[in-house]
Curated annotation (Swiss-Prot):
Gene Ontology annotations of biological process type: translation
NCBIfam families on file: rplV_bact
Name of one Pfam family that matches: Ribosomal_L22
Keyword Cytoplasm: no
Homology family: Belongs to the universal ribosomal protein uL22 family.
Job of this protein: This protein binds specifically to 23S rRNA; its binding is stimulated by other ribosomal proteins, e.g. L4, L17, and L20. It is important during the early stages of 50S assembly. It makes multiple contacts with different domains of the 23S rRNA in the assembled 50S subunit and ribosome. The globular domain of the protein is located near the polypeptide exit tunnel on the outside of the subunit, while an extended beta-hairpin is found that lines the wall of the exit tunnel in the center of the 70S ribosome.
Protein name: Large ribosomal subunit protein uL22
Quaternary structure, from the entry: Part of the 50S ribosomal subunit.
Annotated GO MF terms: rRNA binding; structural constituent of ribosome
PANTHER family in the record: CHLOROPLAST 50S RIBOSOMAL PROTEIN L22-RELATED, LARGE RIBOSOMAL SUBUNIT PROTEIN UL22M
Keywords: Ribonucleoprotein, Ribosomal protein, RNA-binding, rRNA-binding
Annotated organism of origin: Dechloromonas aromatica (strain RCB)
One GO CC annotation: cytosolic large ribosomal subunit
Record-linked InterPro entries: Ribosomal_uL22 (IPR001063), Ribosomal_uL22_bac/chlpt-type (IPR005727), Ribosomal_uL22_bac/org-type (IPR047867), Ribosomal_uL22_CS (IPR018260), Ribosomal_uL22_sf (IPR036394)
């Protein structure tokens, strides 16, 4: 049985999120949590929260054994982009792009 968890609108670029997602794809959840706990990237903490949510969903909703769960699928999609302006010299302005992403994770036996 498979259980899903998702987090949408995360203030992280999809490219940086995919770097972290590739670290835990296909791993047992205990090992994946250990990898994410010691990964220095910003996205690691975010993915860890999603993984913990998926584990809690599997345990509460499906009565799954945590020791048998693995990360079946994890993918990071591009979300909306926040566009901001910053002041520059001589009355000009530059655009600042603040990307977001959506993280989807599935755990199962």
């Amino acid at each position: 049985m498979e259980t899903r968890a998702s987090l949408r609108g995360v203030r992280l670029s999809a490219q940086k999120g995919r770097l972290v997602a590739d670290l835990v794809r296909g791993k047992p959840v205990g090992q994946a949590l250990n990898i994410l706990a010691f990964c220095p990237k910003k996205g690691a903490g975010i993915v860890k929260k999603v993984l913990e949510s998926a584990i809690a969903n599997a345990e509460h909703n499906d009565g799954a054994d945590i020791d048998e769960l693995t990360v079946k699928t994890i993918y990071v999609e591009k979300g909306m982009v926040l566009k901001r302006f910053t002041a520059r010299a001589k009355g000009r302005g530059n655009r600042i792009i603040k990307p977001t992403c959506h993280i989807y994770l599935t755990v199962g036996n």
